[in-house]
């Protein structure tokens, strides 16, 4: 069971290198979805926090109060919500910190982008339709249940996410279905474009094989699909094999996009490296 702890912080608007806002807002520290491939696991601040990732959520109860003050002093034009947490995880239902933040941003006319994988975001459609939500990057995937149970056991089901994305699209809210991560030989994105008829595009990100816990991720995969052990070993060690695989994936996505007459972006990490986080554009 996830432990909730109420905490007070000294600042809520923090600079970000992600080009979706001048500042980032994280209403919580921690995320009970506990995804094994979450980038935040390697965050220096998070790594110093006692407790296993996913077992705790620090609720920043004074975040709305701070935001009211910092908007006046910092005058942000656009902010990002949820770079190191999911703003709509179950803790939000109890504390409604994100709800208060959205109300404040709307009141002051501050635009915002949102990163989430939670269908609970649809509960705030009324706030999101007030004209200041620029875009929601909604993380989706499509792998068999046994694989999901190993890699993101506490996250919302994929079908629930698909329904939430389409609900937001039906309400004319800007949403980017963000298929991430593409798990080699596991993720099924065939006909993915047709699953979101009102979306002009879908974006994709490949699994980052340089994550600090990549061996744990691979172990989880191999426990379900032992036949993939050799292939994942090659992805770690063989640059030519790695690059050829992802080139094939790109071609498959392009073929699907052309068939659906939709736009796309594909982000593939360099061998033993990262891609540049240029989401806006």
Each language-model region and where it sits:
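C-terminal accessory regions of radical SAM enzymes
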Residues: 229-281
